[in-house]
Amino acid sequence: MDKTYQPHAIETSWYQTWESENYFAPQGAGDSYTIMIPPPNVTGSLHMGHGFNNAIMDALIRFRRMQGRNTLWQPGTDHAGIATQMLVERRLEAQGVSRHELGREKFLDKIWEWKAESGGNISRQIRRLGSSVDWSRERFTMDDGLSDAVKEAFVRLHEDGLIYRGKRLVNWDTKLHTAISDLEVENHDEKGHLWNLRYPLADGAKTAEGLDYLIVATTRPETMLGDAAVAVNPQDERYKALIGKFVELPLVGRRIPIIADDYCDPEFGTGCVKITPAHDFNDYEVGKRHNLPLLNIFDKNANVLPAAQVFNLDGKLNESVDGTLPAAYAGLDRFEARKQIVAAFDAAGLLVSIDDHALKVPKGDRSGTIIEPWLTDQWYVSTKPLAEPAIAAVEDGRIAFVPKQYENMYFSWMRDIQDWCISRQLWWGHRIPAWYDESGKVYVGRDEAEVRAKNNLGPEIALQQDNDVLDTWFSSGLWTFSTLGWPEKTKALETFHSTDVLVTGFDIIFFWVARMIMLTLHLVKNEDGTPQVPFKTVYVHGLVRDGQGQKMSKSKGNVLDPLDIVDGIDLETLVEKRTSGLMQPQLAKKIEKQTRQEFADGIASYGTDALRFTFCSLASTGRDIKFDMGRVEGYRNFCNKIWNAARYVLDKGEDCGQNGEAVELSLADRWIISQLQRTEAEVTRQLDQFRFDLAAQALYEFIWNQYCDWYLELSKPVLWDETASIERQRGTRRTLVRVLEVALRLAHPFMPFITEEIWQRLAPLAGVEGKTIMLQPWPVANEARIDQAAEDDIEWLKGLMLAVRNIRGEMNIGPGKPLQLFLKNVSADDQRRLSENDYLLRKLAKLESMTVLTDGAEAPLSATALVGDMEVLVPMAGLIDKGAELARLDKEIQRLQGEVQRVGGKLSNAAFVDKAPPDVIAKERAKLTEAEQALGKLAEQHARIASL
């Protein structure tokens, strides 16, 4: 083995071996165990969330594979409708070509060309992270098979009365000209205004104060052209007498009613709210409750129409309401219209005031444009009939959420579910399988031939397919079963569905998880007709944030690419990566400064195993995962520790009883074997419960602290002892080898590369056969090998050695200097342990002599420590220069007093505490606590030495 651990020297070659040997394919004889990879967007590259997600899924798959389960981890990518279309459009625009010039078919050809060129990027990254997915089953949401499944699902849902076309309010992107989902809308906190406008009362009505007008407050004065009512709270005494009366809508002259609705907050503004059902989601709900007309005043660009389009709630034209609008505003952009309408109110004496107001402004996450609630014809899934069985599946335990608290989030969304808009005005995606004749009548079918045959439509009747495509979430909602061959009854579907676990972030429980559950329960049935669930467990993890708890985003400049941590990146390349392609280029300087401060030397290459172990160690039950580069460095050191331990074991491991020769186990051997059983049980228990953090912690504690720090040291005196029997030395060598071999198997799901590399060399010594560690059996604890007596004896031994080590440290005595040791208050058990471990203690604690003092015997002036009730004494005569040591301690105490004063002063400064970020204050408080504790210890040490 190389002297130092170099991850890049082993990782790629091992992955190629695993893949070429087909080790990732299903092959276990046990029950199936299936995970479907949440398909990343084909446009992108893996971010830290993907890296985290993959580490968790691979740990599960490798764990279950080693347990003998018939594992399938199936990879794939999502066609990502809007993201992909925008990306290819931008590429074409750079060449001076628009998609409209190309036409739909040629534009789609360009997208497929682009996918062929760059679609392999995600696959390359997944490989680099060591993910043991079955590449022979890689799928894409626009594959032919998946396209057939999508059409089938649409047609069946339509036949069951669960898909319909209707005119409703949607999030409209005025730049991309498509409806978008709530997940694609980002709410930005901005400073805006609240306009207070007078609306004259009609028919001579007066308020309780005798006024002939109401004052309404609005953040969007331009939408007043589409007002359908003014609402007040039914309990608001000021306006009770006006409910049912009318106001005259300024500038337009239309009479609109005053209605009572609990939506109005009497404390906000004047308590009167204008209701515009066609341009505000809350107003739309009020409109439904009061059967108000919907007046659409904007076109698809959010420019004012010459006349409002007036509809009833059922989407049919309302011809009884006059949609006339002032000609002055026709064709104006919504923000220009706002200026002119406010000016007209002012000129008419109807503008009361303009107040500053904090707003949440909805913007498209791709286009950056302000989203307009807009009334348009779209396709919808009727979700309430699908939600009820989906709620029941979680309530009755067929699907479990881990952690369980996320069930409440799921239930709250599902019990307040709205119909799902599934159409998008894009070209890239699954085209809706619906056709229209010249009269606008719609026909749904799997293809045009089926539509004609089913409806007896001859060739003389022209049919035009719907131009819209389906929401990406619709096809990904079928992901667990469409990728296994549904609607055909394939062997793969029969074997691997329902899947076992879905690993996902909490942010898409509604957008993806809930929809998968609803669609699967409705579309996939067992032989007896009972519905199948898509997965049995949903493991929900938090969002990966930076070390300060900030969300990682391009605009914050704190994004980390997992592969940059794996392979390393120099500072200049990192700066270039973080500052290029920004939506807000003005942030580039700030991001560059921040990056140069945080990563002055770039990012070192830590390797995949260190990153994966970091992710697993962070996988707690919280909603936030604070990613800390210090942890990666720590786990890279852990890899080094394992590597160095393996080099020692391989060096000492020959003649370890691999051919059945006799062995005798020492106390330390029995202890480490006992600890191994406990670790096997603990790691298995925590993985079964999805506590990857606790499993990683148990593994780290065993390998680093027990095996490397203690057992390797305890093994050395046995191997050096010329008086030890061959059987005793062979027993220690065998224990060194076999315990490490089992520990490697336990660590393999977390750290696949380093464990495989070492295992290949160690397996012959351990008497283990097999081509790869990944197909070795998972370790199972043997309770018969738990040796409580050995554990108690070694804990006592460790206590004594640590006591001596601490005295050396406190008294500044070199580790190689032999010590005399006196012991008082020695019990019979202590005496036995001293006798049995005399040689071990003398060697490891560097003891010149050990003397047990009888009761009443005087001890020389000594530094002391306790091990249980036994007193440990180290005479100081000749070991330290008392004066020099006190002077050294005085100097250090003085330095720490200065530090306490400096940090304490900073924290008592109100100006600092008020202005500094919380994480900076927390760091300063931690610094103060640390300095105070160190000062206390040094003062104790000073007193002890002064008393000698």
From Swiss-Prot:
Motif residue range(s): 'HIGH' region: 40-50
EC number(s) stated in the UniProt entry for this protein: 6.1.1.9
Pfam families the UniProt entry points to: Anticodon_1, tRNA-synt_1, Val_tRNA-synt_C
One Gene Ontology cellular component: cytosol
Motif 'KMSKS' region: where in chain: 551-555
Primary gene name: valS
Highest taxon of the lineage: Bacteria
Cross-referenced InterPro entries: aa-tRNA-synth_I_CS (IPR001412), aa-tRNA-synth_Ia (IPR002300), Anticodon_Ia_Val (IPR033705), M/V/L/I-tRNA-synth_anticd-bd (IPR013155), Rossmann-like_a/b/a_fold (IPR014729), tRNA-bd_arm (IPR010978), tRNAsynth_Ia_anticodon-bd (IPR009080), Val-tRNA_synth_C_sf (IPR037118)
Protein name: Valine--tRNA ligase
Taxonomic lineage: Bacteria, Pseudomonadati, Pseudomonadota, Gammaproteobacteria, Pseudomonadales
Subcellular localization: Cytoplasm
Annotated organism of origin: Pseudomonas syringae pv. tomato (strain ATCC BAA-871 / DC3000)
One of the GO biological process terms: valyl-tRNA aminoacylation
Swiss-Prot/TrEMBL domain comment: ValRS has two distinct active sites: one for aminoacylation and one for editing. The misactivated threonine is translocated from the active site to the editing site.
Quaternary structure, from the entry: Monomer.
Enzyme class, UniProt record, top EC level: ligase
Main location: cytoplasm
